[in-house]
């Protein structure tokens, strides 16, 4: 799309020169935008079209008002990047803060790529070898771009997660920017009329303030309400919760049928919601359908402060591999046992005195002495409490463990929400367990087609008999609970 726009504008410029007429960038852009929209109105929702048109608009409108002889290249780069920040945030949910400096190297080398490409195209008519030789400078410059961008992205703070900006912030961004541009225009006229030294200093200050204010509009977000999300990960589990205090936790994060789950689902979800880091990432057990995505998230370098696992299961081979990778990434490891709790409000961390009244996470099972032949029965069982909301998350435990917990805790298990154990298996969600929990609603995380027969009709019938509303990721996609309302993506 950007190629069609660029070629069209180039043809218009050449045509104007041949006819002895003058043209300008914005008029040429307007003609090409009308043509492209006439050809296919749907390109308006295509990111490549928006980026291409937006960049030219920035060059034609913003650059003349923000650039000046002193620091011309730097402010030219800023003037192109700044108007595009909301577009970048809408499509990638993060901002590359060092892009301005990278462009100082990239933009001056663009003529090399352009000229080399044209010469190689012409030489290709006479043979492959001349074309290869002439295109080498373009290849070298593009390779340099790739290496440079890779190095920059490894720097601390190279990109900041903003989340998808809402319409209000986008409107505010461009309204404020328009105000600054009017001020820049007036100040430039004053400078040209002779108010040079004092006006020049004020003009420089205005540009810095403009840049800082516009970036702050995208970065600063109001406090949000508590939020629970059951991600659509196929045959697996992935649960996010944000406490009223703003602390974010994640439970599991894996799938047996979705490849690159961490990159394509979990990271996209976290970035879209503007989650800059996870304070506690709980791992129920080390089956791949619970940790495959987490492993990818660790590899990506995303901020995770603590990974929490059951102390009784920490020595399993698969768990040891995951924890080794986490330690290599600088993530703190917490071992949790029955009775331990993490209180969120006072950030007191892991402690061995259970306090059910405090907001946070309490471990119900397993204890140091618990053993089981099946790894599923050594899953971390957690009770979450946050104000008036509470939930139970039991991984893949069977009815045997459920029975043990009912006998030990009884009515203390009562919660609002229940994440169905073992993806709705017939061997979980027993009648006594559901009666003890008495949840208002439950979520089943599984794939529409799986070889395990999840969710089992027997287990779902037991939930329905208890007057519990049941939601399925295989039908609804991602399930969200926020401000006492349940939202579904409605995949079907």
What are these language model-derived features?
Residues 109-124:
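Internal helical hairpin/lid segments
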Residues 10, 43, 103, 122-492:
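Non-globular, low-confidence helical/coil segments that flank catalytic cores
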Residues 1-100, 116, 163-222, 431, ...:
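Hydrophobic alpha-helical transmembrane segments in multi-pass membrane proteins
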